[in-house]
Amino acid sequence: DPFQCLAVCINLSEAVRSSSPETSVSHIPVHQDGSCNGLQHYAALGRDKLGAAAVNLVAGEKPADVYSGIAARVLDIMKRDAQRDPAEFPDAVRARVLVNQVDRKLVKQTVMTSVYGVTYIGARDQIKRRLKERGAIADDSELFGAACYAAKVTLTALGEMFEAARSIMTWLGECAKIIASENEPVRWTTPLGLPVVQPYRKIGRHLIKTSLQILTLQRETEKVMVKRQRTAFPPNFIHSLDGSHMMMTAVACRRAGLNFAGVHDSYWTHACDVDKLNRILREKFVELYEAPILEKLLESFQTSYPTLLFPPLPERGDFDMRDVLESPYFFN
């Protein structure tokens, strides 16, 4: 934002010109952002070492870029496919066309929306738009085929790098489907004790006839939307966890005398308190995930619906959550 940039420039120039820059007063909120925060929460839930490294839950010499990491995997797959015989593997031709198009920008939107359960069709349309912007493939049918192939490869790469995230996402969706099939909305309680209910119900139409006209009213019925309950639960559950992390951080900042503001995975404080906020937000993330979150969720489902059979919890890795405390790029 140009005005934010201007404000920082003015503030910085005042400090530099001051006889004592270190005591110069600054009211600028300094932002610290998560690294693909939804995937950070999935990696923590799954104790996934590979996923944790990709989204900066562990220390590194430089920030890990999950989008570049996925792009590199996609490129490797396409290079292998390009070597195959088109007579046996028709996508080999598409791979040869796309190897020069694969970059961070091509896959970024799909990686970002993977946390929200992006479908194959959604990924295909996202990648098709990126390819169309570049004008690399003129023929519409060839563009569509290339987008289909690229979407399939991108989702494969995501599944390989974030295997634990995919299994947890699937498990959450299956639990939601089982509950919604009983015409019940999915309910859960966040780690901070906030009860949540997914409000998705089918819409009914009611006709009201008057002497002048016929009015149609749309109102929710008692019938829940099974598909939407299933697809919405994984992202909604993750959002309830990132909201819990923010609230825990905000409360700790208040107790420590820090000014705090934030939007989603962007936490703000004044320049003099950046190091303190860094420490607090890491400590609260570790505290959040040292609790058995998925175990408690399954237990609550089994208690609320004792006659229903839920799938077992997905397998998890052995990532040490306390590594987050030493990761400089977890939020930066």
Curated annotation (Swiss-Prot):
Pfam families found in the cross-reference section: RNA_pol
GO biological process terms held by the UniProt record: mitochondrial transcription
Keyword Transferase: yes
Keywords on record: DNA-directed RNA polymerase, Nucleotidyltransferase, Transcription, Transferase
Keyword Nucleotidyltransferase (UniProt): yes
Purpose of the protein: DNA-dependent RNA polymerase catalyzes the transcription of DNA into RNA using the four ribonucleoside triphosphates as substrates.
Gene Ontology terms, MF aspect: DNA binding; DNA-directed RNA polymerase activity
Protein name in the entry: DNA-directed RNA polymerase 2A
Active-site residue numbers: D33, K108, D265
GO CC annotation terms, alphabetical: mitochondrial DNA-directed RNA polymerase complex; plastid
Enzyme class, UniProt record, top EC level: transferase
Record-listed E.C. numbers: 2.7.7.6
Gene: RPOT2-SYL
InterPro entries for this protein: DNA-dir_Rpol_C_phage-type, DNA-dir_Rpol_phage-type, DNA/RNA_pol_sf
Catalytic activity, as annotated: RNA(n) + a ribonucleoside 5'-triphosphate = RNA(n+1) + diphosphate
Similarity-based family: Belongs to the phage and mitochondrial RNA polymerase family.
Organism in which the protein naturally occurs: Nicotiana tabacum (Common tobacco)
